[in-house]
A protein has these predicted regions:
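Noncatalytic alpha-helical scaffolds and linker/capping helices
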Residues: 79, 85-96, 100-114, 121
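Active-site C-terminal subdomain of aminotransferase-like
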Residues: 1-57
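Short acidic (Asp/Glu) and glycine-rich catalytic loops that position anionic groups and cofactors
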Residues: 10-22, 51-56, 88-95, 136-145, ...
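Conserved PLP-binding catalytic core of the aspartate aminotransferase-like
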Residues: 47-76, 99-101
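Conserved phosphate/anionic-ligand binding catalytic regions in large, soluble enzymes, centered on
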Residues: 4-13, 102-103, 171-176
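Flexible glycine/proline-rich, aromatic-decorated loop/lid segments
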Residues: 1-12, 33, 69-88, 129-135
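Flexible inter-domain linker/hinge segments
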Residues: 105-176
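Flexible, glycine/charged-enriched surface loops at secondary-structure junctions
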Residues: 25-30, 44-55, 87-89, 122-129, ...
Length: 176
């Protein structure tokens, strides 16, 4: 069925992503994502917004300070062509965002600027460093991951493509 195919494709893609990046690569990416979230949490709170979550990895939700509306945040975000999450929980006072592996210093400062503008404040430029992680130890794994050789060999585009072609050649299906 289409649903099974869609799930299998996502699982296959995730497996190849893990194989391509390996344990060290995934840890580096995770550090990058979380560090960006930590910087955003710290800087946006300095503007008077209240962080609504105690533990986070990449997703933040902020309660808006008195006098700041979702519409003001939305308008400032749209000026920068950035989409944020606006909680429709009835209170109209929560805005969220998520970071990913592509976020950079410019985008971090743009996001901080959006929240500053909505609050009628200015924000200083912040430097983005990948070493700002503050993960709760209870959120961390204590076992080794991705120890099989496939996760430690194919870290170049050429190597990964050769590996994928090799898998394709070994495929035994009803189509051949």
């Amino acid at each position: 069925s289409n649903i099974c195919t869609a799930k299998a494709l996502n699982a296959t893609m995730a497996g190849f992503y893990a194989a391509y990046h390996g344990r060290e690569g995934l840890e580096r990416i995770a550090r990058h994502i979380h560090s960006a979230a930590v910087i955003l949490a710290e800087e946006i709170q300095k503007l008077g917004y209240k962080l609504k979550v105690d533990k986070f990895f990449d997703t933040l939700r902020f309660e808006l300070p008195e006098g700041v509306s979702q519409a003001a945040v939305r308008d400032a975000a749209l000026e920068q062509e950035i989409n944020l999450f606006y909680c429709n929980c009835g209170c109209g006072k929560v805005v969220g965002l998520s970071t990913d592996e592509k976020i950079n210093e410019k985008e971090i400062n743009t996001l901080i600027g959006i929240f500053a503008k909505a609050a009628g404040k200015t924000a200083d430029h912040v430097e983005f460093l990948d070493d700002r992680t503050v993960l709760d130890p209870t959120m961390l794994r204590d076992d080794e991951i991705l120890q099989q050789s496939v996760f430690n060999i194919y870290h170049s585009e050429t190597g990964m493509m050769r590996y994928m072609k090799n898998l394709e050649r070994r495929d035994i299906s009803l189509a051949t």
